[in-house]
Amino acid sequence: MSVDVINRPEAEDLDVQDVVAAGELESCNHLLDDPEALNRFYEEKGYILLRGVFDQDSVARARDEMLAVAAQMGLVEPGDPTGKWTGKPSVGGMEESDLYAGIAARLIEDPANQAVMEKVLGEPACSVPIVQYRTYPPRSKLGTVHQDGFYSPGIQDYRPVWISLTPCTRDMGGLALAVGQNKRGYFHNVGKPNPFPIPRDVIPAESWATTDYMPGDVLVVHPCTPHCGLPNNSDRLRVSFDSRVQSAANPSAIAATVKSFTPTTVTVDADRIGEITLTIDKDSYLRPINPGVRESFDDFVNYMKAGMRLVVVRDGNRAVMLRKAAEG
């Protein structure tokens, strides 16, 4: 049963430490060549888990590239493919660093991997220009329990994808999902400030599940599925990234460069489309500076800058969302 919009200022927040993922995620490899059955599972359970389907050479290249960045930061020894932590603290806030630029795109656009994504989406796929890279040491600060779709209004028919590039056993802090809870709407509490934390009492405790992830596995998470990263209690980095795929023929989220703006419009040079002018209003979801912070419509002209690289989601000539691009 769907929940109504949650507006409970006094509710106790759900903390990642409260999540006990006792369930086991199911492999969907046997459904990969049956589009209808695969989509039914996705809509019913809120995820698709595919084991070992990405080309192993492409996964190893992406792993080595991410670990090379981690080595620059002193988190691992250069050339160590296992990602064993050196003990140096992470500076944090590196999820969308330009140091990782291109790694996810090269992996997902590998022809063998594109064939997998086409089966997942049901048509040729391209990436939504939003990628977050994770090289998380043990005992890193935990994120929140959240639903991706709540923060991405207007993006239609896309599928979030999470990929681990090194073995990620339960003690390394892989992803946990609230299975089947995608059918109940959004749980985020609009009665509290951003990031609108989910109340502790709305997700059944028995719905949480996880698994041991291996390189080449692909986890597709429904935009409405509550999920979180679990604590890393190992001696290694969690090396993973999350992206999103959408229709290549009809993408709803496009990368664009800001050319000019007024208090109520923005003109951008959009990839594969060209120059377009969109209206902005108080309901536009504006995150052009920090992807985790919604900015005020009233201050639009004060924080916008020509040359900004954005993800643009539009409905006709109206901007539904402007977000800082992280093209991967």
Name every feature range the model reports, one short phrase each:
Residues 153-170, 212, 220, 244-247:
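Short, conserved beta-strand element in jelly-roll/cupin
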